[in-house]
């Protein structure tokens, strides 16, 4: 379970989050839905410790997010933000292997390679496995980024607007895939959405 207790945040006198408390249940997909500027992405970034939490407390699987060592947290939760700093001159296969870094530390095992191959198949990326990210369409790149996060194989997966750059066909297929992978591996997935239509594929 992810427990959020009394989280507040503001910028320049403007309140972004005001004493937010909620429990995200273990297992399944939970959607955070709301208009732009509602603080959804900010809350997600606090869950993943991408910015320091000054007011409130967040625990993930019983771990205090602000106090847990980085190496342990990287094996507990993974996140895909709307903006990433991944070097574009990297192949899709290498990108997915990068998701395994908390485990292999630069020396991939056969198990790491098998996980990457399974992800390439699950996300329909085999055809693009050796292509650079710069050679992909926006939708293909987005699928590769999500596949990288799932290669990390954490119990908790945080996805900020994962359907960006996807047409209706791939958006529907991706939500179906996320639900299947979440259920099969007993993961807890939190997705930030601004569109209510994909909610039918979530659990909450």
Where do the protein language model's features map onto the residues?
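Catalytic Walker B motif of ABC-type/P-loop ATPase nucleotide-binding domains
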Residues: 157-161
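Conserved small/polar residues in nucleotide/adenosyl-binding loops
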Residues: 202-203
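Conserved ABC ATPase signature
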Residues: 132-136, 140
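Helix-to-loop junction immediately C-terminal to a conserved catalytic motif
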Residues: 48
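Conserved ABC transporter NBD signature motif
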Residues: 56-64, 73
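The feature captures the beta-strand-to-loop junction immediately N-terminal to the Walker
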Residues: 33-35
